[in-house]
UniProtKB/Swiss-Prot annotation:
Binding-site residues for heme b b566, renumbered to this chain: H97, H196
Function statement: Component of the ubiquinol-cytochrome c reductase complex (complex III or cytochrome b-c1 complex) that is part of the mitochondrial respiratory chain. The b-c1 complex mediates electron transfer from ubiquinol to cytochrome c. Contributes to the generation of a proton gradient across the mitochondrial membrane that is then used for ATP synthesis.
GO biological process terms held by the UniProt record: mitochondrial electron transport, ubiquinol to cytochrome c
Protein name: Cytochrome b
Amino acid sequence: MTNIRKSHPLMKIINSSFIDLPAPSNISSWWNFGSLLGICLALQILTGLFLAMHYTSDTATAFNSVTHICRDVNYGWVLRYMHANGASMFFICLYLHVGRGLYYGSYMYTETWNIGVILLFAVMATAFMGYVLPWGQMSFWGATVITNLLSAIPYIGTDLVEWIWGGFSVDKATLTRFFAFHFLLPFIIAAMVMVHLLFLHETGSNNPTGIPSNADMIPFHPYYTIKDILGLLLMITALLMLVLFSPDMLGDPDNYTPANPLNTPPHIKPEWYFLFAYAILRSIPNKLGGVLALVLSILILIIVPLLHTSKQRSMTFRPLSQCLFWLLAADLFTLTWIGGQPVEHPYVIIGQLASILYLSIIILLMPLTSLMENHLLKW
């Protein structure tokens, strides 16, 4: 008799995706982040669902409902901080996952890569809308500033902003629709993750060498299930340390002040995971130019496969490209730091230089270095 996991219509799909899936024998811990992201998404949906049971999306009661969750709901504070810091873990895993893709040339699987970039945009949109929900000062002003950027679009900008707001300012209608979309998007993301995996399983995983590994594959279970569990334990440990010891470390103190349209906070800034893009936005003095740079800072990932000029897929054996990659990583840390600083000298010029460097590494320096490496290897 055939094993049920190989014959049952539903079990068959799970089996071919997570159990008998052929995987390269040499993939490192950098390949753990895909499964960690799946777990992060599940955790966010679960904690978010329970938070939504107690949250009210009304300007008069939103702030108090979050306070009520923390004070009166059984383990409500755990739910709230798991959800808030879970988002931070989500983005740490996301950025490491994208970084892995850039380093090892995984972007050559263009369908998987492009769906991944769309997923990145969707997660960023979800996180932004979630940040508005507690209706603190930074929630309100963050929503006002970021949505107002759309007014830079010629001709339709102002109408578009008022349409998104549902009025002439960020108000009751805005909060309600942001809650609706914040609840809906994670399920759309989950569906897109399925498509992401579907395309990945068409080609199979890449590996650190960048060389096809069809001749040397091992089953996903038990080898990579146990390896993923180790990654999961480390991530859960980090998350619990954050939630139980310093839950507000990554948040903004201004968000403990209820939203007040008449009082602007001295420094309006988003959560830490958006600071690099915020720094790029601020480094251009023109409003429309800044908005375009902001979108391009992420959208640039779409054209990375087109800019691949090397005859090798991975950076494992390309020391010059490795230097550029780590320069790019350092540049992103610099941009993140600048995004959290006030708009004054010397932060402005540092931000502008870091923004120019970010774009030039990806568009210009990486492809040129790859060509040079080809030449050095007489290819």
